[in-house]
Amino acid sequence: MKLATGLWVWGSLLMAAGTVQPSASQSVCAGTENKLSSLSDLEQQYRALRKYYENCEVVMGNLEITSIEHNRDLSFLRSIREVTGYVLVALNQFRYLPLENLRIIRGTKLYEDRYALAIFLNYRKDGNFGLQELGLKNLTEILNGGVYVDQNKFLCYADTIHWQDIVRNPWPSNMTLVSTNGSSGCGRCHKSCTGRCWGPTENHCQTLTRTVCAEQCDGRCYGPYVSDCCHRECAGGCSGPKDTDCFACMNFNDSGACVTQCPQTFVYNPTTFQLEHNFNAKYTYGAFCVKKCPHNFVVDSSSCVRACPSSKMEVEENGIKMCKPCTDICPKACDGIGTGSLMSAQTVDSSNIDKFINCTKINGNLIFLVTGIHGDPYNAIDAIDPEKLNVFRTVREITGFLNIQSWPPNMTDFSVFSNLVTIGGRVLYSGLSLLILKQQGITSLQFQSLKEISAGNIYITDNSNLCYYHTINWTTLFSTINQRIVIRDNRRAENCTAEGMVCNHLCSNDGCWGPGPDQCLSCRRFSRGKICIESCNLYDGEFREFENGSICVECDSQCEKMEDGLLTCHGPGPDNCTKCSHFKDGPNCVEKCPDGLQGANSFIFKYADQDRECHPCHPNCTQGCNGPTSHDCIYYPWTGHSTLPQHARTPLIAAGVIGGLFILVIMALTFAVYVRRKSIKKKRALRRFLETELVEPLTPSGTAPNQAQLRILKETELKRVKVLGSGAFGTVYKGIWVPEGETVKIPVAIKILNETTGPKANVEFMDEALIMASMDHPHLVRLLGVCLSPTIQLVTQLMPHGCLLDYVHEHKDNIGSQLLLNWCVQIAKGMMYLEERRLVHRDLAARNVLVKSPNHVKITDFGLARLLEGDEKEYNADGGKMPIKWMALECIHYRKFTHQSDVWSYGVTIWELMTFGGKPYDGIPTREIPDLLEKGERLPQPPICTIDVYMVMVKCWMIDADSRPKFKELAAEFSRMARDPQRYLVIQGDDRMKLPSPNDSKFFQNLLDEEDLEDMMDAEEYLVPQAFNIPPPIYTSRTRIDSNRSEIGHSPPPAYTPMSGNQFVYQDGGFATQQGMPMPYRATTSTIPEAPVAQGATAEMFDDSCCNGTLRKPVAPHVQEDSSTQRYSADPTVFAPERNPRGELDEEGYMTPMHDKPKQEYLNPVEENPFVSRRKNGDLQALDNPEYHSASSGPPKAEDEYVNEPLYLNTFANALGSAEYMKNSVLSVPEKAKKAFDNPDYWNHSLPPRSTLQHPDYLQEYSTKYFYKQNGRIRPIVAENPEYLSEFSLKPGTMLPPPPYRHRNTVV
């Protein structure tokens, strides 16, 4: 009670200024309905707002305040007292909303059909400007709708307001006030406000007008006592109990008094029992009663409206524009031929006839010529459809002339003009207003409604079959004595009479327009509407009439139809009925007795007696009655008032209480039975589940089990060396793995989860481990193991050359076409494997492809990858960061990811390679990418790409996902291109392009700077035997080459494998040029017989073996090596390029002569082991076979110019005669060639065991299914990557500066 008293003390200070003023002083302005739309110029937006609402008190419509800057003066809004629609305050930057005098929001129209007051997003994201206070200190009433206050960063005190006191219907669905406003950093209300205020001072306390009222008040109040109730017509509070003390009116304001309705235009006169015109009538205009509607409004009944409804027409009576019901068709004026929109038209034709639909008045002329009726081929106008001429049935007036010189042959009259009343003749055709010429098929005119031809003459000639024209007295149609008639050369009158073409006998002597009683100019006896009849239905018939002269008029609808032989009525109106069909009120028949009709001083209520006559109710009955006494008054419980005596109400109350208790008991029993049945049903379902649980799975999927194994590593086996980078979940270190109980050192990458991350990050971290451990492919990074220390660690193989994006950018001057296309094939094969395993990558890009060696790349970063279930076709992602510029359009719009969306990303990745690390859509804001793609624009064609390569990219960027190629097709397409790379990629100096040395990479050098890798072993070489059930290869011991040796002890023995003509491979996997330079190798399980010693370069040594005819299969004993060496296995990515094939193996393993055959599938390139001992003190690493020490050094030949270049696949112009293996023999290295082998990576090429080489299909199966590689690179934090954008930042309203778009390309 103290709270209420304190508030009312403050509220009393405002009462004097808050009462309703007469409507004459109210300044009314129109509202808007633009919602969040605004003008492009903010200055113009502010000026428009000020122009609308300056000096405005009542807003007839919606008050919308949007997109106003912080420095604008909004003091003009203080004059607004009332809003009939909704109030919208959004997207503004000002601090204070000065609607200090706003009392009531009526909510006749709601924002989003729900809110009468909506205030949101009123702050500037990149600044400190925003709405801080709501100056609504006098707002006390919202009649309809709820309140929405949200996302106002700096707004204070809104959460202290008692909104239930303001909103008339405070349902939970109408109230929204969330914590995104600035409530946490705001001050407290003044102590006199008791916790509810609009601002910090005592002048901003909220005034309560409903929740503090006494129970007896049925509305607002101005104090806590019973005597302080406001009048029931008050809204928003009051200063006293009268209807003139209201702050605002619930319904209408009549000169300062709040009333239920405005004084009506007609009032019931109890003396005459008639509705009479009320001279004190007023019209409803919004919530006000006005004597006269505004000049731009019209009167409809007793209201001011903007336009008449479709069933009424606007007329002016006594200087007042009013809406009157249309007697027939509401008028519509149209332009005639030669006027207005038809100024250039010469006739009515098929191109313009539709413009005359529903026309009642033709402003101009109607002309019918042969080019309109039968068509105009010259102007490509078709003949008119005769049915369309019926549009003229609505025409009542033609202000000009009617010219008919052509008519459809199947129409014998002009009945389409049956409603034509007047031909004005304001424009004449050679002095004529009606012209009908040479219409041979016309038999009658049938202008049955024509009453006047205001000006001009009549010309009707040469109509050989026209009759009835001679019966008409044409002069009765004329308005002046100067008008003439020319009617000749039509059908003779006697011929018409002979054929019975005469007027109906009911027509008078004035004539007729055609046959039948409806064509008479006037009737001989009686008429009903337009039809002449013999007599009226006075005593019989379906409906009864009375005679009004010669016109039969139907009796009033309130007259009861009498028996045959008795009159139903004596005249017009309900007071001339013989008997009433419903009730009789005085002399008038009415549909019901008056019930609440407004009288001169009060409302009229009557009841009907047993004779159905109406009598007045007792004066105490204010809601109607059933009889003459006060005990017969009608009582409505919801009004809160009763005129029944107390003794009459007691039984009703008792019956209501008993009935309510009975209903409550029934509801309680029903609820108990429902709960019991539900419990029993649940127990039965659980019993059935337990019975069948161990019998068979409930939902067998049929999916094969994932038998991938996860290696758990101890923390003591790992040593962290150097930080490589930081990611969203943790940090990546370069490290060393020393397996427990062994002496080998394996370089690895260690990804450690941050200690501050939560459980969700741990789950996502392990999900990534699951996916990486399940993948097994030479071009996918796979997990080596997991260390379950307090901070989870993922251990992967260390990639020595970093990501492909940085690699191509660093070596763009040394990368040729062959290598680019090889990478395209490898990435496609990796993605094809993912598609076979039903895994969607979702983040394929050049930054997520790592380089193990220049010839071998691997796909990594499975942080966004998702496995699909057996029956899933797509994955729908939740919110989060996304690489927008690499994503397909369906991913951006619907977050729907499929294998075909990965194809889109693959196309962007290829574009990055072909531009040597170019940024896609560089300079374009990420938020503009979706619109750009929808308009058809794509990445431009890279300069080095031919149209063949670019079209493959374009196919990857098709909007329809099903139209994009599959990864299998992409792998095959780029394999075909890789066989002839210079045909598809045009790179200047491609023939002389030198592949960068594996050790030249900056990333690789940084890895080697801090750790001695002398004893390092690659992770794959350590782990592969555990993944293959194939015999381990046998190796010879490795020694150093004596650089002073110049002779060869033995020539290399021959061995065979399918090879290209431009290189050969030793049996250990090494490569050599035509000059015979040895390459890194690994031994196979077979030995080869010795060959004769060759002189000079090693190429000469091979000449003998090449030309000795058929070579034989080598046989030699095995040599055992240590266990660490036996872990090494064949690299799955070894392949033999197919340019210039020399031959193929026969059944015994020998090479057959070369012959034409189809090109083999493009296989994976040879891969080096990046971690071997480096050269020290200028010494060259020795080949393992000591017999190479006898090689002699001869003078270099002219073709030795390539000897110092890296030897990779498909990079040589010359071809070697044949390919041979070398075993147990030594090649000498010429002095000039020593430096070609400074890079230790060149000494470590490997091939699979011989059994694998003899079966290429077997090799391909293993390389696809079992080999896997690991990587230690982690993707950077998503928020730091500018190519990622969150879902929220793509919403409308996100403001980003639009940099110039330098390269655009459009796909048609």
Swiss-Prot record:
Annotated catalytic residues: 843
Signal sequence extent: 1-25
Principal location: membrane
Residues annotated to bind ATP: 724-732, 751, 797-799, 843-848
Localization per Swiss-Prot or TrEMBL: Cell membrane
Enzyme class at the top of the EC tree: transferase
Record-listed Phosphotyrosine modification sites: 875, 1035, 1056, 1150, 1162, 1188, 1202, 1242, 1258, 1284
Gene Ontology terms describing biological process: cardiac muscle tissue regeneration; cell fate commitment; cell migration; cell surface receptor protein tyrosine kinase signaling pathway; cell surface receptor signaling pathway; cell surface receptor signaling pathway via JAK-STAT; cellular response to epidermal growth factor stimulus; central nervous system morphogenesis
Catalytic activity: L-tyrosyl-[protein] + ATP = O-phospho-L-tyrosyl-[protein] + ADP + H(+)
Tissue distribution of the protein: Isoform JM-A CYT-2 and isoform JM-B CYT-2 are expressed in cerebellum, cerebral cortex, spinal cord, medulla oblongata and eye, but the kidney expresses solely isoform JM-A CYT-2 and the heart solely isoform JM-B CYT-2.
Chain positions of motif PPxY motif 2: 1282-1285
Motif PPxy motif 1 per UniProt: ranges: 1032-1035
Effect of gene knockout: Embryonically lethal. Embryos die at about 10 dpc, due to defects in the development of myocardial trabeculae in the heart ventricle that lead to severely reduced embryonic blood flow. Mice also display aberrant innervation from and to the hindbrain, especially concerning the trigeminal, facial and acoustic ganglia. This is due to aberrant migration of a subpopulation of cranial neural crest cells.
Post-translational modification: Isoform JM-A CYT-1 and isoform JM-A CYT-2 are processed by ADAM17. Proteolytic processing in response to ligand or 12-O-tetradecanoylphorbol-13-acetate stimulation results in the production of 120 kDa soluble receptor forms and intermediate membrane-anchored 80 kDa fragments (m80HER4), which are further processed by a presenilin-dependent gamma-secretase to release a cytoplasmic intracellular domain (E4ICD; E4ICD1/s80Cyt1 or E4ICD2/s80Cyt2, depending on the isoform).
UniProt subunit comment: Monomer in the absence of bound ligand. Homodimer or heterodimer with another ERBB family member upon ligand binding, thus forming heterotetramers. Interacts with EGFR and ERBB2. Interacts with DLG2 (via its PDZ domain), DLG3 (via its PDZ domain), DLG4 (via its PDZ domain) and SNTB2 (via its PDZ domain). Interacts with MUC1. Interacts (via its PPxy motifs) with WWOX. Interacts (via the PPxY motif 3 of isoform JM-A CYT-2) with YAP1 (via the WW domain 1 of isoform 1). Interacts (isoform JM-A CYT-1 and isoform JM-B CYT-1) with WWP1. Interacts (via its intracellular domain) with TRIM28.
Name of the protein: Receptor tyrosine-protein kinase erbB-4
Record organism: Mus musculus
